[in-house]
């Protein structure tokens, strides 16, 4: 496995799945159970999609942002403040699975 992204731990855990970059309401509705939700930030509109995600990675935010708080409530692993997440993880979207290891705030590409 190769580390491809690093951010800040927000909700501990580990998950593996395909990436789904979420930019619109349609993307949220199409997020499948077990996918890795990747977004700039989340809002209350994202909660249903967040509950289906295996893990959440956001480009912005800190330990008290929406993604961090809701992911802890849902028990979903979450990394926030992962600058460049949409661009970097967008490259592997639907192609290979990634492993999110929140303890170190790291995302790895599975080979």
PLM regions with names:
Residues 2-35, 40-111:
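Acidic, glycine-rich flexible loop/linker segments
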């Amino acid at each position: 496995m190769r580390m491809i992204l690093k951010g800040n731990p927000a909700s501990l855990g580990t998950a593996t799945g395909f990436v789904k970059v979420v930019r619109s309401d349609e993307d949220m509705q199409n997020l499948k159970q077990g996918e890795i939700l990747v977004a700039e930030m989340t809002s209350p509109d994202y909660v249903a999609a967040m509950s289906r995600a295996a893990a959440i990675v956001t480009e912005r935010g800190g330990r008290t942002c929406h993604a961090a708080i809701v992911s802890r409530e849902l028990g979903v692993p979450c990394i926030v403040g992962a600058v460049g997440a949409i661009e970097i993880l967008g490259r592997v979207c639907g192609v290979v699975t990634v492993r999110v290891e929140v303890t170190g705030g790291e995302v790895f590409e599975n080979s």
